[in-house]
């Protein structure tokens, strides 16, 4: 039996964490742990917290006076906050494959939901495992299909602890460990009244039974179990605030929808925008989901309130995990990351959820990174950052060589305050990632400090925004004669960025 299997069999022999507490009994290890050093340098632990579908502007202290996230606000004061971080695809699986490999979605081969990541792709967790890290996961992974009740296929992902759960449904009766735990607790997850499907609803259940709290419990158990060992990585993949907008009533009751601003939408703004946005205006997800048209402004505000309420619970659990780090004496040598896999339109531009569009609400996400004594505490940077940059950053922090295939750029100079700039532009793509539209959307987006351009290959048309004059991305200048020179220049930038994403492997061995 190898080290990974031994860790898997022994790490969670301790009893379950008491709900609402950060305390856990340390697990009994039966394998000599390798030194917490590489080339004489101490290797940091990594607590990697990934929310699902949380957009960039949903943290207290980041220009949002309506949401309550005191723990994230405190974490920001101790961390580097990268306010302009962009995913490389606005949909779950392609985005997750991208940031876990440090490679662009089309390079990994996982461009759309329902596809499986190639078996030879190397996740950063697998590289860390090979270097001696004990890697654990609680929650979602989503690097291969999960439809029809099947547990997603796993490549060599490096996780010796794999507590998998996906969404709220019970379509994985033998695999969704959160739902299995609910069954063991004798708890039945409530279903909403028929009239509230597709709208906000306060679930009448104790928050300790949510997938968010369950993931946090698993992480806390892992953290305490590792206190005398190391290095380790714990990947916490919380499903909230992903739709449906169903927080527990405890959290929803803290928000008055009347106090929350309406979505950013100007009547008629979609007329000169791609047809996919008009379809999703009538009903998200290709016409099958939430309709902006057939819901009221009160509904829109209430859905935003519910979304904020879910994020507040995420914040509560972040606080519990950070407390566990402190209690276990590991906070000083642990990198803490808080981020999301993509955003949510949340009614902006008359659209809910996600799809083939590249507005800031869809592709821009939170990114908070703390490493005491190494990264500059309290720094807030508006440098352009791509999610592919995270994997090489973690390897550099651990003193591990960055593989040839990684396409991201290490953020270390930015995080340490050595530089204030990182990229000239960000790149994002959508290649029929949801399979809900006709014609299939095949699109690429590039933005720099002033402009954003999107090109839809099947439509032979696109979007062009002057972000300095129109930060809300309301007015599409694609056909505006006054913007043609700037648009053409951005098209050249887009072509250059697409060429930059060509796979650097296999390595050339000789001239011929």
Model-derived features: where do they sit?
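Formylglycine-dependent sulfatase
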Residues: 2-456, 461-462, 471-492, 496-499, ...
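A short, polar/proline- and glycine-enriched secondary-structure boundary/capping micro-motif
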Residues: 464-466
């Amino acid at each position: 039996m190898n080290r990974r299997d031994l860790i898997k069999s022994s790490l969670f022999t301790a009893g379950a964490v008491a709900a609402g507490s950060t305390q856990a009994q340390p697990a009994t290890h039966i394998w000599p742990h390798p030194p917490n050093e590489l080339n004489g340098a101490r290797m940091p632990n990594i607590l990697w917290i990934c929310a699902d579908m949380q957009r960039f502007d949903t943290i207290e202290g980041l220009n949002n006076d309506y949401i309550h996230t005191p723990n994230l606000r405190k974490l920001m004061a101790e961390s580097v906050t990268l306010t302009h971080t962009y995913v490389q695809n606005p949909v779950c699986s392609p985005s997750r494959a991208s940031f876990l490999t440090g490679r662009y979605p089309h390079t990994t081969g996982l461009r759309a939901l329902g596809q499986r990541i190639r078996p030879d792709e190397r996740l950063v967790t697998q590289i860390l495992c090979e270097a001696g890290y004990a890697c654990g996961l609680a929650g979602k992974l989503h690097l291969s299909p999960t439809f029809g009740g099947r547990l997603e296929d796993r490549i060599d992902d490096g996780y010796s602890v794999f507590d998998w759960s996906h969404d709220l449904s019970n379509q994985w009766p033998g695999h969704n460990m959160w739902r299995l735990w609910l069954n063991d607790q004798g708890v039945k997850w409530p279903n909403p009244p028929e009239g509230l499907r597709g709208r906000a609803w306060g679930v009448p259940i104790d928050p300790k039974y949510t997938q968010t709290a369950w993931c946090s419990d698993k992480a806390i158990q892992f953290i305490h179990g590792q206190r005398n060992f190391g290095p380790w990585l714990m990947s916490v993949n919380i499903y909230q605030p992903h739709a449906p907008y169903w927080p527990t009533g405890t959290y929803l009751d803290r928000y008055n929808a009347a106090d929350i601003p309406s979505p950013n939408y100007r009547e008629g703004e979609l007329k000169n925008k791609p047809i996919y946005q008009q379809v999703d205006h009538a009903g998200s997800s290709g016409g099958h989901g939430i309709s902006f048209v057939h819901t009221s402004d009160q509904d829109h505000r209430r859905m935003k309130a519910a979304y904020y309420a879910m994020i507040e619970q995420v914040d509560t659990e972040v606080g519990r995990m950070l407390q566990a780090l402190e209690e276990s004496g590991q906070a000083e040598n642990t990198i803490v990351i808080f981020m999301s896999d993509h955003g949510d339109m949340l009614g902006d531009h008359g659209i809910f959820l996600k799809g083939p569009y590249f507005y800031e609400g869809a592709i821009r996400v939170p990114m908070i990174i703390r490493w005491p004594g190494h990264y500059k505490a309290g720094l807030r940077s508006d440098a352009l950052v791509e999610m592919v940059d995270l994997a090489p950053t973690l390897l550099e922090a651990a003193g591990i060589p960055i593989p040839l295939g990684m396409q991201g750029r290490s953020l270390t100079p930015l995080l340490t305050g050595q530089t204030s700039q990182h990229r000239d532009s960000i790149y994002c793509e959508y290649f029929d990632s949801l399979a809900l539209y006709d014609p299939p959307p095949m699109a690429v987006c590039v933005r720099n400090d002033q402009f954003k351009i999107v090109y839809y290959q099947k439509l032979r048309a696109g979007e062009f925004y002057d972000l300095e004059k129109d930060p809300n991305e309301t007015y599409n200048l694609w056909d505006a004669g006054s913007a043609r020179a700037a648009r053409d220049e951005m098209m050249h930038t887009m072509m250059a960025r697409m060429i930059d994403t060509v796979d650097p492997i296999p390595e050339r061995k000789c001239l011929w």
